[in-house]
Amino acid sequence: MRLFLLLAFNALMLLETHGFTDETDRQALLQFKSQVSEDKRVVLSSWNHSFPLCNWKGVTCGRKNKRVTHLELGRLQLGGVISPSIGNLSFLVSLDLYENFFGGTIPQEVGQLSRLEYLDMGINYLRGPIPLGLYNCSRLLNLRLDSNRLGGSVPSELGSLTNLVQLNLYGNNMRGKLPTSLGNLTLLEQLALSHNNLEGEIPSDVAQLTQIWSLQLVANNFSGVFPPALYNLSSLKLLGIGYNHFSGRLRPDLGILLPNLLSFNMGGNYFTGSIPTTLSNISTLERLGMNENNLTGSIPTFGNVPNLKLLFLHTNSLGSDSSRDLEFLTSLTNCTQLETLGIGRNRLGGDLPISIANLSAKLVTLDLGGTLISGSIPYDIGNLINLQKLILDQNMLSGPLPTSLGKLLNLRYLSLFSNRLSGGIPAFIGNMTMLETLDLSNNGFEGIVPTSLGNCSHLLELWIGDNKLNGTIPLEIMKIQQLLRLDMSGNSLIGSLPQDIGALQNLGTLSLGDNKLSGKLPQTLGNCLTMESLFLEGNLFYGDIPDLKGLVGVKEVDLSNNDLSGSIPEYFASFSKLEYLNLSFNNLEGKVPVKGIFENATTVSIVGNNDLCGGIMGFQLKPCLSQAPSVVKKHSSRLKKVVIGVSVGITLLLLLFMASVTLIWLRKRKKNKETNNPTPSTLEVLHEKISYGDLRNATNGFSSSNMVGSGSFGTVYKALLLTEKKVVAVKVLNMQRRGAMKSFMAECESLKDIRHRNLVKLLTACSSIDFQGNEFRALIYEFMPNGSLDMWLHPEEVEEIHRPSRTLTLLERLNIAIDVASVLDYLHVHCHEPIAHCDLKPSNVLLDDDLTAHVSDFGLARLLLKFDEESFFNQLSSAGVRGTIGYAAPEYGVGGQPSINGDVYSFGILLLEMFTGKRPTNELFGGNFTLNSYTKSALPERILDIVDESILHIGLRVGFPVVECLTMVFEVGLRCCEESPMNRLATSIVVKELISIRERFFKASRTTWR
């Protein structure tokens, strides 16, 4: 009986204790929730008294005592601060707050969690020092505080956490020296301290970390010789000490002492001496980066490292300009996994061995530029079929380009400048349709510029200056719409500058100086709105300087040594970014402007124009004569003529006004008829119309197998027009749907008079009766073989048969965004009447063979100058102007009129979707948490957390330049999505910003991996 009472008493006490402690955990978590930002708190909606504590989201309890042991709240978009109440969860073993938006400091109360083994607060916005209380958590195995804003030094108390297996402080603002107490962490396997501001030498106590296999110290300010302690860590697999201030020589036996290395990055330091030959004995080695040091001597053979994928030795002083310097390349043919080889900017001599053609078929990057290599390019270079980047510039290579080079169809970057290459530029270059940069400048190429270069539709930079080329500038080059840089200077080109130069609206640099070009400068040159550098000096151009006032961003202009005449245009004075203007040695005359760049005689050269006058004193020109008396006398006689002319003009204007009023009245009488019947004025401008029967045959009876898409007003079919043997897209309208006829008319009216390379081309229309006597309407467009942008952004939602075989690269997305922005700018600004698309979204952006974007579906488009209030409300009643949920501007939801600002909003959403991979209607979003706020909350530190993962593929090194470019893209998107229409960017600015971003990205991609 006594035993029974004792057991009952103990059970009662246990229940009371359990009830008390369970409530403690509950209150601690509710207090934690109260400190979470209100807009993020919905994620924790289950945290209330209606749910059992152990069923709360992210909460795991112990089996016996039902105390909270695990709190897993990673990647839930939570914000606010971390409540000190977290310290009351005394049974907590694991706390995961990874990748949220928590700010403030880490509460000292975390130190009360004596059972804690796993703590992850990485990728937040935490600041301040690491709290000293944390070091009471003596059971900690994993401590991750990476990618925050933590400051102060690495505390010596860290050494008391002797059970630590992983310590990650990457990407903070830690300062000072490493404490010697780190040596106490003898169980440590991973230590990440990269991207901080740590300094000093690595303490010798690190040698005690005998279990460590990953040590990352990259991008700090560490100094001294290669840390001697590291030679003792034979278990190391991943070692990164790059981009510090280390110096001195490496031990010859490094490869013996560290035999298990998979990755070794020591680039960007000040190491001297030779590369230890023992490194080639590490059979497990996959990545070796010793670039950007002061290493000398020969390069050892790496034939015994079969798994080597990356070898970076560039930017050193390796080699001795001898014929044997390149012998090591032959041994690399054994490295069948090699993807990246960078050995440029060294002192390597000798002929380029033919063995490079036998390197790994997986090779993507080959950089031998900036050395002393001679000989010719091996004929079998075409064996490297996966090569994307080939850099052989600044050498002494000679001879013609081998024909097998034309087999490198994946090549994106070909740099051969400053060699002694000869022969003609081969036509097979045009087969390399993926090329983005082609640099053949400063060689001995001769003959004409091949027209096949026009096939390289992805080309961003074309450098063929300083050769011996002749002939005219091929018109085909003017079709490369994405071209940013075009340099043909220093040749013997003849003929005129093509009128089509204005089609290169993305052009930033045009350099055609020192040729034999002639004729007048085309007015279309003023259409190159993104021009920054214009060099046309040393030619035979004549006539007036054309209207270039659209080039408001230009920085350098050189028109010297030509035969130009007329006056100096005043608009040069208004160019705020103009830094250099050379108009010397022409036949210019008249008054020199005195404002803007003309206020400084050192930035403007106008010598050799004998009839110029005026200007500031620095030009030392003769003063301009005032009006001669004879001119004054003539003035009165001209006055009568002016008065008569003005009178006649006013009379004509009055007559024209009366005629216009009459015409408007007549058109209003015809309004109802025109609403329901396509008039000849609408359709006759299109090609010859096609019959219902022809379309039925072309689509196999409108078969479902021919269907390629559907929308609110109809279905799109792929069709083969037998008469023209041409594949087209046929949009058949659902005439039962209210508003279908208005959609048909709007699309015809919108597209009949507009032409732009990024608009889908409307070929013709069909207005007929089907075989059952029903009204039939269809629009026939050119067919886009690569489908819609929507398919590429969300392939998981597409049937496998239509699914793209790969994902879009970052550069391809930028190009598509520029295409779409360009067409909006055209519709909004450059059409005779502004047009608002009103339904811009990924499914309405179609892609052709080259992934050039074409905007489609103008069923909701509005010709804004023809807009009137009555028609707007008629359209609104049929849901016409509302566009698509998620993409439509907020003002449309409250009766706002269609506008170009509404299109800008839709474009902003489109841009965010393109780079996050998330639709605005994603289930993640709701209430005030939208795609906009999701993006805004990640700027600027957490960009990579929201970027579409498919962008971050193996071919893209995610470094600071890439992150910077992505940040700028998102900022443009957010500025387009401003709530107030008046605060949104103009499309012209959007185009300019995106092109500038693309240039930044392109410049970053020109440098090899670091």
From Swiss-Prot:
Membrane topology: Single-pass type I membrane protein
Chief site of localization: membrane
Cytoplasmic-side segments: 667-1010
Stretches assigned to the Protein kinase domain: 702-1002
Phosphotyrosine modifications at: 781, 826, 887
MF terms (GO), sorted A to Z: ATP binding; protein serine kinase activity; protein serine/threonine kinase activity
Enzyme class: transferase
Catalyzed chemical reaction(s): L-seryl-[protein] + ATP = O-phospho-L-seryl-[protein] + ADP + H(+); L-threonyl-[protein] + ATP = O-phospho-L-threonyl-[protein] + ADP + H(+)
EC number: 2.7.11.1
Cited InterPro entries: Kinase-like_dom_sf (IPR011009), Leu-rich_rpt (IPR001611), Leu-rich_rpt_typical-subtyp (IPR003591), LRR_dom_sf (IPR032675), LRR_N_plant-typ (IPR013210), LRR_R13L4/SHOC2-like (IPR055414), Plant_receptor-like_S/T_kinase (IPR051809), Prot_kinase_dom (IPR000719)
Keyword Ion transport (UniProt): no
Residues engaged in binding ATP: 708-716, 731
SUPFAM superfamilies referenced in this protein's UniProt entry, alphabetically: L domain-like, Protein kinase-like (PK-like)
Protein name: Probable LRR receptor-like serine/threonine-protein kinase At3g47570
